[in-house]
Protein backbone atom coordinates (compact mmCIF):
# COMPACT_ATOMS: atom_id res chain seq x y z
CA UNK A 1 0.00 0.00 0.00
CA UNK A 2 1.29 3.45 -0.87
CA UNK A 3 1.71 5.73 2.13
CA UNK A 4 1.88 8.92 0.07
CA UNK A 5 -1.40 10.80 0.39
CA UNK A 6 -2.80 8.25 2.85
CA UNK A 7 -4.34 9.33 6.14
CA UNK A 8 -2.28 7.74 8.91
CA UNK A 9 -3.11 7.53 12.63
CA UNK A 10 -0.03 7.03 14.80
CA UNK A 11 -0.32 6.32 18.52
CA UNK A 12 2.65 6.73 20.85
CA UNK A 13 4.10 9.52 18.74
CA UNK A 14 6.05 11.31 21.47
CA UNK A 15 8.64 8.61 22.27
CA UNK A 16 11.84 7.75 20.45
CA UNK A 17 10.34 5.20 18.08
CA UNK A 18 7.21 7.32 17.64
CA UNK A 19 9.25 10.37 16.69
CA UNK A 20 11.23 8.35 14.15
CA UNK A 21 7.99 6.97 12.74
CA UNK A 22 6.46 10.44 12.43
CA UNK A 23 9.52 11.61 10.52
CA UNK A 24 9.49 8.66 8.12
CA UNK A 25 5.75 8.90 7.51
CA UNK A 26 5.92 12.63 6.84
CA UNK A 27 8.81 12.08 4.42
CA UNK A 28 6.68 9.46 2.66
CA UNK A 29 3.90 12.02 2.14
CA UNK A 30 1.47 10.74 4.76
CA UNK A 31 -1.35 12.93 6.06
CA UNK A 32 -0.50 12.31 9.68
CA UNK A 33 -2.60 12.33 12.84
CA UNK A 34 -0.79 11.69 16.13
CA UNK A 35 -2.34 10.82 19.48
CA UNK A 36 -1.07 10.88 23.04
CA UNK A 37 -2.11 11.78 26.58
CA UNK A 38 0.48 14.48 27.30
CA UNK A 39 -0.77 17.64 25.62
CA UNK A 40 2.50 19.59 25.66
CA UNK A 41 4.59 16.74 24.25
CA UNK A 42 1.91 15.99 21.67
CA UNK A 43 1.82 19.59 20.50
CA UNK A 44 5.61 19.63 20.11
CA UNK A 45 5.45 16.49 17.98
CA UNK A 46 2.65 17.92 15.88
CA UNK A 47 4.53 21.17 15.33
CA UNK A 48 7.64 19.25 14.27
CA UNK A 49 5.83 17.14 11.68
CA UNK A 50 2.85 19.30 10.71
CA UNK A 51 0.47 16.67 12.05
CA UNK A 52 -3.07 16.82 13.34
CA UNK A 53 -3.38 15.91 17.04
CA UNK A 54 -5.95 14.02 19.09
CA UNK A 55 -5.51 13.98 22.86
CA UNK A 56 -6.34 10.52 24.21
CA UNK A 57 -5.43 8.31 27.15
CA UNK A 58 -5.43 4.76 25.80
CA UNK A 59 -6.16 3.38 29.27
CA UNK A 60 -9.57 5.10 29.15
CA UNK A 61 -12.10 3.22 27.04
CA UNK A 62 -14.09 6.32 26.07
CA UNK A 63 -10.89 8.03 24.88
CA UNK A 64 -10.07 5.06 22.64
CA UNK A 65 -13.55 5.07 21.14
CA UNK A 66 -13.38 8.85 20.69
CA UNK A 67 -10.01 8.54 18.97
CA UNK A 68 -11.40 5.97 16.55
CA UNK A 69 -14.45 8.14 15.86
CA UNK A 70 -12.30 11.19 15.11
CA UNK A 71 -10.07 9.16 12.78
CA UNK A 72 -12.72 7.04 11.08
CA UNK A 73 -11.31 8.04 7.69
CA UNK A 74 -7.80 6.74 8.48
CA UNK A 75 -6.28 4.59 5.76
CA UNK A 76 -3.49 3.33 8.01
CA UNK A 77 -3.39 2.64 11.75
CA UNK A 78 0.02 2.35 13.40
CA UNK A 79 -0.54 1.22 16.99
CA UNK A 80 2.81 2.05 18.56
CA UNK A 81 1.90 3.22 22.08
CA UNK A 82 2.94 0.97 24.96
CA UNK A 83 3.90 1.06 28.62
CA UNK A 84 7.18 -0.61 29.67
CA UNK A 85 5.49 -2.88 32.27
CA UNK A 86 8.68 -4.36 33.70
CA UNK A 87 8.84 -5.89 37.18
CA UNK A 88 7.56 -8.96 38.99
CA UNK A 89 3.80 -9.43 38.82
CA UNK A 90 3.46 -9.25 42.62
CA UNK A 91 4.90 -5.73 42.60
CA UNK A 92 1.96 -4.34 40.62
CA UNK A 93 -1.17 -2.83 42.04
CA UNK A 94 -4.45 -3.86 40.44
CA UNK A 95 -4.73 -0.40 38.89
CA UNK A 96 -1.24 -0.63 37.38
CA UNK A 97 -1.98 -4.08 36.03
CA UNK A 98 -5.18 -2.88 34.38
CA UNK A 99 -3.43 0.11 32.87
CA UNK A 100 -0.69 -2.02 31.29
CA UNK A 101 -3.24 -4.43 29.82
CA UNK A 102 -5.40 -1.56 28.57
CA UNK A 103 -2.64 0.43 26.88
CA UNK A 104 -0.53 -2.43 25.54
CA UNK A 105 -3.25 -4.82 24.41
CA UNK A 106 -6.86 -3.73 24.78
CA UNK A 107 -6.41 -0.33 23.08
CA UNK A 108 -4.72 -1.63 19.91
CA UNK A 109 -7.28 -4.43 19.68
CA UNK A 110 -10.20 -2.02 20.05
CA UNK A 111 -8.72 0.53 17.63
CA UNK A 112 -8.17 -2.25 15.10
CA UNK A 113 -11.75 -3.42 15.46
CA UNK A 114 -13.28 0.03 15.12
CA UNK A 115 -11.08 1.33 12.30
CA UNK A 116 -10.95 -1.88 10.27
CA UNK A 117 -14.73 -1.74 9.85
CA UNK A 118 -14.37 1.54 7.95
CA UNK A 119 -11.34 0.28 6.01
CA UNK A 120 -13.18 -2.86 4.89
CA UNK A 121 -16.15 -0.76 3.77
CA UNK A 122 -13.76 1.29 1.60
CA UNK A 123 -11.91 -1.81 0.40
CA UNK A 124 -8.56 -0.35 1.38
CA UNK A 125 -6.41 0.04 4.48
CA UNK A 126 -3.57 -1.26 6.60
CA UNK A 127 -3.06 -1.91 10.30
CA UNK A 128 0.41 -2.08 11.83
CA UNK A 129 0.75 -3.35 15.39
CA UNK A 130 4.12 -2.57 16.94
CA UNK A 131 4.97 -5.41 19.27
CA UNK A 132 8.30 -6.65 20.55
CA UNK A 133 10.64 -9.61 20.43
CA UNK A 134 9.20 -10.08 23.93
CA UNK A 135 6.15 -11.39 22.09
CA UNK A 136 8.18 -14.44 21.10
CA UNK A 137 10.38 -15.14 24.13
CA UNK A 138 9.71 -14.78 27.86
CA UNK A 139 12.22 -13.23 30.26
CA UNK A 140 12.44 -12.74 34.01
CA UNK A 141 10.53 -9.82 35.56
CA UNK A 142 8.54 -9.11 32.39
CA UNK A 143 5.57 -11.43 32.90
CA UNK A 144 3.00 -8.67 32.40
CA UNK A 145 4.83 -7.14 29.44
CA UNK A 146 5.29 -10.60 27.89
CA UNK A 147 1.57 -11.27 28.32
CA UNK A 148 0.61 -8.14 26.39
CA UNK A 149 3.15 -8.69 23.61
CA UNK A 150 2.42 -12.41 23.22
CA UNK A 151 -1.25 -11.47 23.06
CA UNK A 152 -0.65 -8.73 20.50
CA UNK A 153 1.29 -11.12 18.28
CA UNK A 154 -1.46 -13.73 18.32
CA UNK A 155 -4.09 -11.08 17.66
CA UNK A 156 -2.19 -9.58 14.71
CA UNK A 157 -1.53 -12.90 12.99
CA UNK A 158 -5.14 -14.05 13.39
CA UNK A 159 -6.67 -10.71 12.37
CA UNK A 160 -4.57 -10.74 9.20
CA UNK A 161 -6.24 -14.02 8.24
CA UNK A 162 -9.69 -12.70 9.12
CA UNK A 163 -9.24 -9.67 6.84
CA UNK A 164 -7.67 -11.56 3.96
CA UNK A 165 -9.36 -10.64 0.68
CA UNK A 166 -10.93 -7.43 2.02
CA UNK A 167 -8.21 -5.07 0.80
CA UNK A 168 -7.08 -4.44 4.38
CA UNK A 169 -3.66 -5.69 5.41
CA UNK A 170 -2.36 -6.38 8.91
CA UNK A 171 1.31 -6.37 9.89
CA UNK A 172 3.18 -7.06 13.11
CA UNK A 173 6.49 -5.25 13.63
CA UNK A 174 8.65 -6.60 16.46
CA UNK A 175 11.72 -4.60 17.48
CA UNK A 176 14.56 -6.12 19.43
CA UNK A 177 16.66 -4.09 21.86
CA UNK A 178 16.43 -0.45 20.76
CA UNK A 179 19.19 2.01 21.58
CA UNK A 180 18.48 5.72 22.02
CA UNK A 181 14.88 4.83 22.97
CA UNK A 182 12.97 2.52 25.25
CA UNK A 183 14.24 0.78 28.34
CA UNK A 184 17.98 1.11 27.77
CA UNK A 185 17.86 4.82 26.96
CA UNK A 186 15.48 5.48 29.86
CA UNK A 187 17.33 3.45 32.48
CA UNK A 188 21.00 3.54 31.50
CA UNK A 189 21.17 -0.26 31.66
CA UNK A 190 23.32 -2.12 29.16
CA UNK A 191 21.88 -4.75 26.81
CA UNK A 192 23.05 -8.35 27.28
CA UNK A 193 26.61 -8.99 26.15
CA UNK A 194 26.91 -10.20 22.58
CA UNK A 195 23.50 -8.87 21.53
CA UNK A 196 23.47 -5.97 19.12
CA UNK A 197 20.86 -3.21 19.23
CA UNK A 198 18.82 -1.43 16.58
CA UNK A 199 17.90 2.24 16.16
CA UNK A 200 14.45 3.86 16.24
CA UNK A 201 15.04 4.69 12.57
CA UNK A 202 15.44 1.02 11.73
CA UNK A 203 12.16 0.26 13.49
CA UNK A 204 10.46 3.05 11.52
CA UNK A 205 11.88 1.63 8.29
CA UNK A 206 10.46 -1.76 9.24
CA UNK A 207 7.00 -0.25 9.70
CA UNK A 208 7.14 1.54 6.34
CA UNK A 209 8.30 -1.69 4.67
CA UNK A 210 5.45 -3.61 6.28
CA UNK A 211 2.86 -1.22 4.85
CA UNK A 212 4.43 -0.98 1.39
CA UNK A 213 4.84 -4.74 0.99
CA UNK A 214 1.92 -5.97 3.11
CA UNK A 215 4.31 -8.01 5.24
CA UNK A 216 2.85 -10.34 7.84
CA UNK A 217 5.65 -10.09 10.40
CA UNK A 218 8.75 -7.89 10.44
CA UNK A 219 11.36 -8.61 13.10
CA UNK A 220 13.62 -5.58 13.47
CA UNK A 221 16.47 -7.26 15.30
CA UNK A 222 19.97 -8.57 14.56
CA UNK A 223 20.35 -12.18 13.45
CA UNK A 224 21.55 -13.44 16.83
CA UNK A 225 18.48 -12.09 18.64
CA UNK A 226 16.10 -13.43 16.02
CA UNK A 227 17.67 -16.87 16.38
CA UNK A 228 17.62 -16.74 20.19
CA UNK A 229 13.98 -15.66 20.28
CA UNK A 230 13.02 -18.43 17.85
CA UNK A 231 14.78 -21.03 19.99
CA UNK A 232 13.22 -19.61 23.17
CA UNK A 233 9.77 -19.80 21.61
CA UNK A 234 10.20 -23.48 20.77
CA UNK A 235 12.20 -24.55 23.82
CA UNK A 236 11.22 -22.31 26.77
CA UNK A 237 12.75 -24.60 29.39
CA UNK A 238 16.12 -24.49 27.66
CA UNK A 239 15.87 -20.69 27.33
CA UNK A 240 15.09 -20.41 31.05
CA UNK A 241 18.28 -22.27 31.96
CA UNK A 242 20.39 -20.15 29.61
CA UNK A 243 18.99 -16.92 31.08
CA UNK A 244 19.67 -18.14 34.63
CA UNK A 245 23.30 -18.80 33.76
CA UNK A 246 23.70 -15.39 32.10
CA UNK A 247 23.43 -13.65 35.51
CA UNK A 248 21.28 -10.74 34.34
CA UNK A 249 19.78 -9.96 37.76
CA UNK A 250 21.70 -6.69 38.20
CA UNK A 251 20.61 -5.27 34.85
CA UNK A 252 17.05 -6.46 35.38
CA UNK A 253 16.80 -4.76 38.79
CA UNK A 254 18.19 -1.53 37.32
CA UNK A 255 15.60 -1.51 34.56
CA UNK A 256 12.72 -2.37 36.90
CA UNK A 257 13.55 0.37 39.40
CA UNK A 258 14.03 3.01 36.70
CA UNK A 259 10.72 2.16 35.02
CA UNK A 260 8.65 1.82 38.19
CA UNK A 261 7.32 5.39 37.94
CA UNK A 262 6.08 4.80 34.37
CA UNK A 263 3.53 2.12 35.26
Model region roles, listed by residue range:
Residues 14-15:
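Conserved glycine-rich cofactor-binding loop
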Residues 90, 139-143:
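Active-site loop immediately N-terminal to the catalytic Tyr-X3-Lys motif
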Residues 132:
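Residue(s) in the substrate-gating loop at a strand-loop-helix junction
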Residues 88-89, 93-101:
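Substrate-binding pocket helix/loop in short-chain dehydrogenase/reductase
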Residues 172, 192-226:
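C-terminal helical subdomain
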Residues 112, 148:
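Active-site helix of classical SDR
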Residues 55-66, 94:
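The beta1-alpha1 cofactor-binding region of Rossmann-like NAD(H)/NADP(H)-dependent oxidoreductases
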Amino acid sequence: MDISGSKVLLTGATGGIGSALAGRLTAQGARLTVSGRREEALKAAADAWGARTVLADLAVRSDVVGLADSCADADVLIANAALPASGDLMDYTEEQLDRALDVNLRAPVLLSQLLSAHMVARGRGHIVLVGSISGKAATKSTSLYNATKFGLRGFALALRQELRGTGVGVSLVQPGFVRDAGMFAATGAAPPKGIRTVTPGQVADGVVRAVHRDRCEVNVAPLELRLLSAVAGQFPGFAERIQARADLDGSVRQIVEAQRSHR
